[in-house]
Amino acid sequence: MTHSVDAILDATGLNCPEPVMMLHNKVRDLAPGGLLKVIATDPSTRRDIPKFCVFLGHELVEQQEEAGTYLYWIRKKAD
C-alpha cells in the first residue's frame, strides 16, 4: 500500500529504547493528523510501536515486515 507521508523516521540499526524515544520526539514535531513513516530493524519495535500508538492515542495505519526491516505508518492524533 502506498501512503503519502509528511515525515520519515529512519531508526535503522538502533535498538530498544532508541527507536521509540526518537519516535516520541518526531511525533511531537508532526502536525495533528500528519502521517509518519518509521523504518526500523529492531524486532522489539513490533511490540513497542503498536503499544506506543495505543498509549498516546495515535493511529497505527499500517505495519509491514520486509527482510528484517520493519515499516510503520503512524497518523498523529488530532489535538
From Swiss-Prot:
The keyword Cytoplasm applies. Its main location: cytoplasm. GO terms for cellular component: cytoplasm. One of its GO terms (biological process) is tRNA wobble position uridine thiolation. GO terms for molecular function: sulfur carrier activity. It comes from the Bacteria. Signal peptide: none annotated. Keywords: Cytoplasm. The active site is at 16 (cysteine persulfide intermediate). It is found in: Cytoplasm. InterPro entries: Sulphur_carrier_TusA, TusA-like, TusA-like_sf. Belongs to the sulfur carrier protein TusA family. This is Sulfur carrier protein TusA. It comes from Pseudomonas aeruginosa (strain ATCC 15692 / DSM 22644 / CIP 104116 / JCM 14847 / LMG 12228 / 1C / PRS 101 / PAO1).
